[in-house]
């Protein structure tokens, strides 16, 4: 799937050396793979953002105040979901992503 085909984008905000971010990476990868397989109709693109790459500027724009955190954007790059709770269980992360998408479709 090319970038133009994504209807939603989910971003994992992380930073190098963050112990919690490193603990979250396997959960993030597993969740992304499962959602891509289970919900292809959502056309979700998954990516990571190193918050140190722009000195937290992007995070400040969307009120993302720490790591690890997650955001969901629609195809117009509008923020439709922001989770700043840090480490999540896989079911919590999946629920956050799907609820963000479903609530934007109402």
Show which residues each predicted segment covers.
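Short active-site neighborhood of thiol/selenol oxidoreductases, capturing the structured segment around
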Residues: 3-16
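Core residues of folded domains in eukaryotic genome-function proteins
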Residues: 6-9, 42, 66
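Short, structured motif recognition centered on aromatic/hydrophobic residues
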Residues: 10-13, 28, 70, 74
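Thiol-based oxidoreductase modules, predominantly thioredoxin-like and allied folds used
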Residues: 13-14, 22, 32, 37-56
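The canonical Cys-X-X-Cys-His
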Residues: 18-21, 70
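Cys/His-rich microdomains that often coordinate metals
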Residues: 25
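A short glycine-leucine-enriched loop at secondary-structure breakpoints
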Residues: 60-65
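Non-catalytic, surface beta->alpha helical segment in thiol-disulfide oxidoreductase systems
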Residues: 66-106
